Design a protein with these regions (language model features):
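Signature of N6-adenine DNA methyltransferases within the class I
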Residues: 1-2, 6, 15, 19-36, ...
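Conserved beta-strand scaffold positions in the cores of enzyme catalytic domains, especially
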Residues: 63, 186, 339-340
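Polybasic, glycine- and aromatic-enriched phosphate-binding surface used to engage nucleic acids
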Residues: 147, 272, 276-433
Length: 433
């Protein structure tokens, strides 16, 4: 596969697959018939049992049931910087030797989990261990963790969502990547290239990098490829496909961007963005919305014809209420309110309400207490603002939002001056943006 070819695997390499799953990458590596050692880890007991049966006669493939993010054996392999975040004192001479040699693995490959729920107790542990990192997202922690496990000069290739490139919550990770690795290549492509995967709000990416903390990493050129139409094109970027675009940036230039964001456009537009004295956050509150914790249970659709409505229940029209109360609809056993979710076919005004969220008082009380639900930025629910779906599109379709709860996949823009609402709505829908 493309990812395996990017690692340039050699005899005697020690390789890690931190979320081995069915062993697809392992099979590809074994087919190269190299004299290598593979550590295959997974948190799922069923997957591990399958892997052990699959590779029972291969002593060079070691399968372990473990949580990669908290595994103590991997802690021993990580370089000194992460150890100091795990504990205050580490005096073991053998571990010092491993640390001084900069990690343990020559190559790391994987498709780490994303969006996995972390309970609050585990979050506390992860916050202590991975200081400064956003611990609610697993894939970024896997990336951060695995770079520490690489030897200097070791290579990593991961397939992960592309949100680490631009979301503010991943600022610290981007800085770490740009200062501690040479990023060779990033491919960005639709998530629906792979069966059963379709984020809607982001693309997938394949990142290939080499661990190197020298000052020279800042002079490294990062190549970013976009415009893929089919999954087959992922392995054919050298064939000069007409639809592919290649952007090349020095890591030092990306470090100059606000929050170290990967702004994927031509350099003249990057300069305009970086030189701007007024940002949208200066004139408006920009927030994401609500998550029920179990959308199939609490979210309904008006019609099965709506995009993304598969497996959702249709709403009972007799249970829809005009309620704008954060505490929920009172004196009803089951009630729903209009919900802003998904993309819009039109700009400025959505044609009709298509989604509904359960909002009776008992259910709202449940959301507030439930560990999986996110009753976030609730002071903006039912307010007047602008809704922009977090979907990849050639054209932004911003719509007016009044008296609605909005989904976490929606960016809500709430101008600090009420007289600016229509100006900003027009601006967001203009060709300038």
């Amino acid at each position: 596969s493309y990812m395996i070819s990017k690692l340039n695997i050699k005899d005697n390499d020690i390789i890690l697959e931190p979320s081995a799953g069915e062993g697809i990458f392992i099979d590809g590596i074994i087919n190269q018939q190299k004299n290598i050692q593979i550590d295959a880890l997974d948190i799922d007991e069923k997957a591990v049992n399958i892997l052990k049966k699959k590779y029972w006669d291969m002593p060079n493939v070691k399968v372990r049931l473990t949580d990669t993010l908290l595994d103590r054996q991997l802690d021993m392999y990580a370089d000194r910087q992460l150890w100091l975040k795990i504990t205050d004192t580490l005096e073991d001479k053998e571990l010092d030797y491993i640390s001084d040699n900069g990690g343990y693995y020559d190559k790391i490959i994987g498709n780490p989990p994303y969006g996995a729920w972390q309970d609050y107790d585990k979050r506390k542990i992860l916050k202590k261990k991975y200081k400064g990192q956003y611990v609610k997202e697993t894939y970024t922690l896997f990336l951060y963790r695995c770079i520490f496990l690489l030897k200097k000069g070791g290579k990593l290739s991961f397939i992960i969502p592309d949100t680490f490139l631009f979301l503010n919550m991943h600022k610290s990770l981007r800085e770490f990547l740009l200062k501690s690795t040479k990023i060779e290549e990033i491919l960005i492509f639709p998530s629906n290239f792979f069966p059963g995967v379709n984020f809607g709000y982001s693309n997938l990416s394949i990142i290939t990098l080499e661990k190197d903390d020298c000052e020279s990493v800042k002079d490294n050129d990062v190549k970013i490829f976009t415009g893929f139409n089919t999954v087959r094109e992922l392995g054919r970027i050298d064939e000069n496909s007409e639809n592919l675009q290649c952007f090349c940036y020095k890591q030092s230039d990306i470090l100059k961007n606000e929050n170290y964001k990967f702004i994927i456009t031509d350099n003249s537009k990057i300069a305009i963005i970086n030189d701007s004295k007024v940002r949208i956050g200066d004139v408006a509150d920009v927030v994401t919305g609500f998550y029920s914790g179990n959308n199939k249970e609490f979210i309904c659709v008006k019609s099965k014809e709506i995009k993304g409505a598969k497996n959702y229940r249709m709403v009972d029209c007799d249970k829809i209420y005009d309620c704008y109360d954060l505490t929920g609809i009172k004196n009803v056993a089951e009630g729903y309110v209009a919900y802003v979710k998904g993309s819009s076919d039109t700009r400025y005004i959505r044609k009709e309400d298509e989604w509904y969220v359960r909002w009776d008082k008992e259910t709202v009380d449940f959301y507030i207490k439930d560990k999986k639900a996110r009753f976030q930025n609730s002071k903006f629910y039912f307010k007047t603002g602008i809704a922009i779906p977090m979907v990849k599109s050639k054209q932004i379709k911003a719509t007016l939002m009044r008296n609605r709860v909005f989904d976490q996949s929606i960016v809500g823009i709430f101008p600090k001056g009420k007289d600016k609402i229509y100006y900003m709505l027009a601006l967001m829908n203009s060709n300038v943006i």
